[in-house]
């Protein structure tokens, strides 16, 4: 993960957290020598939160709204580090689809044709229901095809890794010989 960004604005706090911080400070003032464990303190705090009036809760909710507005304002002005996405090697073999995805590909057009106003999500849910109600005999061709594709993928992956190791080895050898000269 690395270091946290020190300039990033602090996240907004809920009304309950504002209440809890206030309750803790009051409790320490009233009973400075008393120690409460986290579990016991949380229990007392939640009991108190449930017992206070809506009027009192409104004060904490207003504080939470102000804090939320502050956070949103600071985030609009904040320009953080952009995380670089690791680029995928275009020569690397792609993972094969599962038996369900193969089934979905075959039935997508039919479902979309029957229900043209459905979104992709709705079609996918319907395909999932169809898959779960399909018997094993109908699933078998998809599972066999997926197994073949998976075996082919593992072979390609092994060849790709060996090829990458070969490139690294050649690079190291050429670097060593250039250093000797």
Curated annotation (Swiss-Prot):
Chief site of localization: nucleus
GO cellular component: chromosome; nucleus
CDD domains for the chain: HMG-box_HMGB_rpt1 (cd21978), HMG-box_HMGB_rpt2 (cd21979)
Domain of life of the native organism: Eukaryota
Pfam families: HMG_box, HMG_box_2
An MF annotation (GO) of this entry: DNA binding
InterPro entries reported for this sequence: HMG_box_dom (IPR009071), HMG_box_dom_sf (IPR036910), HMGB (IPR050342)
UniProt cross-references to Gene3D superfamilies, sorted A to Z: High mobility group box domain (1.10.30.10)
Residues annotated to bind DNA: 9-79, 93-161
Region (Disordered): 80-100
Keywords assigned: Chromosome, DNA-binding, Nucleus, Repeat
Tissue-specificity statement: Expressed in adult germ cells (at protein level).
Segments of skewed composition (Basic residues): 80-89
Subcellular locations according to the entry: Nucleus; Chromosome
Annotated family: Belongs to the HMGB family.
Name of the protein described by the UniProt record: High mobility group protein B4
